[in-house]
Amino acid sequence: MSAKYTILEELIRPVVEGLGFEFWGMEYLSLGKDSVLRIYIETDAEKGIDVEDCARVSRQVSSILDVEDPITGEYNLEVSSPGLDRPLFSLAQYQAYIGSIVSLRLRVPFDGRRKFKGQLMGIESEDIVIRVDQEEYLLPIDLIDKANVVPQF
């Protein structure tokens, strides 16, 4: 995890949790002038996350970020639920989705490839076990750039 990510999480997590939501995770994409800070929030409530929830979190987070100013330049702030194809950020989230189909993109190639799609079989220490075409891979979580649950209908 980068230092910028850690600083942003330390500012944002308490705001999200203070509003009664779970901080699911975030993505910071620095794309030159068009940077994006995407925050995912979750709730235990049956109604789920709605637009008003996202707007409320967005206003509060925006206020904190305006004061603390951890991001240089302009950026777009997006707040949403993780959705059906939810991204996975923590070991606890991976643990909760063992048995599910996941799509992974690695920072650097592992065994000659950067993309994996298969069944999440488990966690061993700091590694993710994924089965792709009857072959199991043990991937260090630090190598994972992006991970999403693949919805099954």
UniProtKB/Swiss-Prot annotation:
GO terms for cellular component: cytosol. One of its GO terms (biological process) is ribosomal small subunit assembly. Pfam families: DUF150_C (PF17384), RimP_N (PF02576). The keyword Repeat does not apply. It comes from Marinomonas sp. (strain MWYL1). This is Ribosome maturation factor RimP. Gene3D superfamilies: Ribosome maturation factor RimP, C-terminal domain, RimP-like superfamily, N-terminal. It comes from the Bacteria. Keywords: Cytoplasm, Ribosome biogenesis. Required for maturation of 30S ribosomal subunits. It is found in: Cytoplasm. Belongs to the RimP family. Its main location: cytoplasm.
